[in-house]
Amino acid sequence: MPSLINFDAISSLKSSLHGLSICAFNHLHHVPQHNGSLAHEGPTNQTDYSSRHHESQFSQEAHAEQRSRDDEEANSFEGSCNNSDQSWTSRVTSKKNEAGTESGDASVRRIYVTSIPEEHRHLPSQWFPSNKIRTTKYTPVSFIPKNLWNQFKNIANAFFLFVTLLQCIPLFCPEHLGLSFIPLSVILLTTAIKDGIEDYRRCVLDKKFNNTLTWKLVGFNNANALGEHIGLWRKLKKFISHTVADMSYCLKNSGISSGLATLTVDNISHRHSLESDSAFTLSSVSQDSLEIHEIGNSGPSNSFSVIQEQSTGSSNAKFERVCRKSLLVGDIVKVLADEAIPADLLILSTENSNGVCYVETKNLDGETNLKDKYALCSTKCCKSEYRCSAASFWVECEQPHADLYSLNGVVKAPGAVQSPSESTNGRKIHEEPFSISNVLLCGCTLRNSKWVIGLVLYTGSETRIQKNRGLTPSKRSRITRDLNWTIILNFLLLFAMCLFSGVLRSIYSAQNNSARVFELSKNSNTAPAHGIISIFTSLILFQNLVPISLYITMDIVRSIQSYFIFSDREMYDEKLDCPCSPKSWNISDDLGQIEYIFSDKTGTLTQNIMSFKKCSINGIRYGKSHNEDTCIKKRRNLNYNENLSCKVDLDKKKMLETLSLSDSPNPESITFISSKFVDHLQSNENYIQTEACFEFFKALALCHSVVTDVQDETLIYNAQSPDEEALVKVARDFGFTLLNTKNRRYTIRIRGENKNFRVLDIIPFTSTRKRMSVIIRDEDGIIHLICKGADTVIFPRLSSGQNNIIEKTKKHLASFSSEGFRTLCIARRTIDKQDYLEWKVNFNEANSAIHERNEKVSKVSEMIEQELELLGGTAIEDKLQENVPETIALLAIAGIKLWVLTGDKVETAINIGYSCNLLDPNMTIFRIDANSFGALEEVEAFIRNTLCFNFGYMGTDEEFRFLLKDHSPPSPKHAIVIDGDALNFVLSEQVSFLFLMLCKQCKTVLCCRVSPSQKAAVVALVKKSLNVVTLAIGDGANDVSMIQEADVGVGIKGVEGQAASMSADYAIGQFSFLGRLLLVHGRWDYKRMSQMISFFFYKNVIWTFILFWYQFYNEFDGNYIFDYTYVMLFNLLFTSLPVIIAGCFDQDVDASVSMKNPSLYQRGILGLEWNGKRFWSYMLDGIYQSLVCFGVALFVFKFGDFVSWTGRNIECIEDIGLFISSPTIFVINIFILMNQERLNLISLITWMFSIGVFWIWTFIYSEVGPSYAFHKSASRTCQTFGFWCVTVLTIALCLLPRFSYICLQKLFYPRDIDLLRRRLCAKSDDETSSSSSFATDIEMCEQCNDPLSSKKNSGIVTSVSFDDSNK
């Protein structure tokens, strides 16, 4: 018989738990792990980490390999001028000064590799979080208390908890003590289940993310103070949970394995993470190690190294696979190709000898282009496990923050020992600064590089990607905000009713008569106490006046509405495989009340797919286009030749026949059409122009930061912007093909011959500089600077003697801008070698600065970007997206005002405005720019004069308050164009209200040259000052601020990435989908939500006031006229489903009619579906119907007798309650059904279900229920003819006034929707099916006095314009 007890396993378990208890003791007492005592999580077999800095020297071979140079070329010239992005300096500082300046700087993070310097050991310990990500709100232990706490933060839930607790006191509610908890429990349980499911999904994603495997260097010393500082209670919980889990694991496996000898403290602490990944075991960790062969140091000969000559590495150091959650600050990790970056890493070395690698940041900022990153010169030698473990240095960097594009720090390493005369403490400290270009951020993916070794700088919650999460502000819809005041009014009404009941109860109790004394044995001395008790009893009785389930019902309805938006195939983009994705489910009704839309231009109104169309070279203009140019000329009523298209096609054909040097794989895709340019490029007669064309296109092929890649034998360009890609592609199409950009060498095939250029420096583009420059050295050793940028920054930097070409180029660029093209200038200069070396020293010093590095680099860059030679200018077309003009026309008819906020030039924005129907030739355009108005007072005077002479306003506060209430469409004859500098003036408090007054009189507002912060400021100004619902739409990272500021943010998934769509409330594929999102789903959702909330208050009022009227009949003693189960199930089963169905499915007209008649949307802008008038109309209707329901039953019982079929009189309170509750349930459900705009099968089914459930419950409960008084009540009352008479009479009297009013209103005072539906009903199905998708054949009825608007170019016709008297 086999043994049932494994004694070896038990023995091993004892020793393991003993070690675990020691670890827990140290953990609970917070023993810091310094200088080799590395206590961290991870399933690795750790060696002795107590070893210090080794004193043995490298072998001669390793030393020679460390000092190897990049190549002979770098040795001859670049020894004194390093890569600009990786510049470094060495400085000598004393240990005394070093310690003195760093003693207590909390703004600096220090990370030590291998050991802590002696002078730093007195510094306070720094605690770092683990790399474990936790986005869940709850844990299994904290879920119930924390979720309940969050739910009871809602004042309504807290109120109902108080009422429920009151019901537990027999003095206030002597019966049904247990049942009182059911309604609140159902609400809390439903919400808890929803929150639990959402949190479980987050937990699954967290677990998957945390258990992703990565390569980590083990067997070396991580000398930092590790782990996050957590409280004693959390440590105790972790200790208990880990102990229980590990014991269960050990007992589970004790019969399978021979023992648990390999179970140690280190791998116990992470047993959970190991078990969660089926492909990851302890054995696989030890076997799945990674060998890295040493590669020689690529640093320059004069650079310092973090590996000292007397240092030696650990022979036990090796890279092993671990879970990413076990990474700690100070760990060294290796990332392989196509792997995700597990933490924020400082790049130590790469596979490339020059230290470059490429990353994709799509998961971080949504951009799909590759970005180049660089290893530090001092750490390029760390290419193997041995060398990484031998390195000794420390890093000083910024504390964690959320900026994705900024990170400054410095690497410091001890140098050689000096004599006392040279230094105070005889220590030389080497420093090399680094920036964001040397850091790999968590969330990026390594591309086009075999491997990268990095040092962990930030982990877990301190990484950039985590710092940028959760920044989206919590938004609430306007209805939700208004609903808070409605709830407050209901609370006040409830308290007034309770106080009224208490006063009358005390009055009734004060009456001394024989009946009261005989029946109650009470006298008037207890009257005040009865009044106080009655107040609390009434609070329990009338609690449904404040709807307990309203908020959860709204969440359910909004979730279903969001699903409908997601499932709409008309908003599905097949090219991007992108549906409309709602990310904020609680603001869907705001989509139906948008009055102002703020839109970006590039990538939002346009496709962000750049096409090179025209250029100016040496004062000669090239290029023809008939796409957007034709459209703009037509809209501006300019002279347009209909034969232009044919001429362009013939010119293209002639060009392709002549062109023989292009390396374009598909010549038909060429967008730059100019046979004259090809003739000049290939001409042997006009040498000067031929050379100019040659140098211009060579500059296009060299001045960029494009990364080349080959996929399936196809050359791919990965550019940081679509503009750069367009420039490089057009150079390729005309024989200047960029073949390779690796190792900072550009290989270009020019006329069939490969040319190599060494990239010495790249001065990147910034929004402040508005230009970028590349410094290159050609094969002849000549150094060139090529610069491209805006004309406003290039022209001032040109050398003298170019007046003729400058004037011609300016005219050409102005012409290009007037045609809607994006323009750039291209310039160059040849630099003397000695001048470059002197500039390089200053540039290195600027790059080495720890503080204000960007400003210093920009200042030094100005020194070399001077005396430029103008080569020419470019014109790039950004085509409009599909149906943009038609969508803008629809939105304008709907009464929505569209403002365009763009960073483009004024001329470009104006012409895009013409092309997309924002502007027309008959408009008067008010231009406000800093060139014309240089001071705030001048801008204010201009706006006041414009308001006075054009619109008759004096700019007073009274006029502004009047305009706040005016939501009518502005004049179609005026528009405003303002630039970013002038916008700073109008955003001031002194001028802002005048600017808004002027904007309300203009159809279109174009804000040009604006920054992201200015975009957000404009949105905030309109939203807060005008008290309107705003929407912002964009596609780039620069649009995130205004998207988050607006009431509704919409992001477009485009070429610029997904930064906007990730921060938005709704993500769509193209701008044209916005029309359907607002005019169909927005209008539906707003109308449905308003109707649902009105129904909710109505049904609760009618039910509550029946109980209130009954109190007059029984002297306010707080008794129910219904059976208590009816009170409990009223909101849960009897009336809830019809309200939810109405909020989800009701619609007045279908989607196609909504799109054809955008003017229907104006009711949402005016707030006509939900306002105080509508609320009180439903409240008063409910009060009236409650009086009818109670009064009819009271009347018939007072003057008549009811006898059951058994001959028994029907006169008990339970029977009378059934006489009242039955018609009440009928009335409520019929009222909801008949107030819906359209009846459908789902509505009828839910209506029958609600009525059926009421009667099923009534019969079952009256037959088998525990209530003696209610026993057989259903069978007694329902078999009497009088019961049904009372029911029919009550229904008729309740519903007759409401539906009489509706009929009269539709006949004599029809709204626009009534006229439209009447017309639709009169039309045949054949006529309806023959209508087009963009034009409606719905004609105006003769009853409406407002005319139809004129047809637009797209064929869109408005339907009925609103007559204010009918609203």
Curated annotation (Swiss-Prot):
Active-site residues, as the UniProt record annotates them: 600
Segments for region (Disordered): 34-104
Keywords annotated in UniProt: ATP-binding, Cell membrane, Endoplasmic reticulum, Lipid transport, Magnesium, Membrane, Metal-binding, Nucleotide-binding, Phosphoprotein, Translocase, Transmembrane, Transmembrane helix, Transport
Enzyme class: translocase
Residues reported to bind a 1,2-diacyl-sn-glycero-3-phospho-L-serine: 1298
Residue spans crossing the bilayer: 155-172, 178-197, 483-503, 532-552, 1092-1112, 1125-1145, 1175-1197, 1213-1233, 1241-1261, 1277-1297
Annotated InterPro entries: ATPase_P-typ_cyto_dom_N, ATPase_P-typ_P_site, ATPase_P-typ_TM_dom_sf, ATPase_P-typ_transduc_dom_A_sf, HAD-like_sf, HAD_sf, P-type_ATPase_IV, P-type_ATPase_N
Chain residues that bind ATP: 600-602, 724, 765, 767, 770, 788, 822-823, 902-904, 1009, 1015, 1038-1039
Comp. bias (Polar residues): 77-92
UniProt-recorded name of the protein: Phospholipid-transporting ATPase C4F10.16c
Species of the source: Schizosaccharomyces pombe (strain 972 / ATCC 24843)
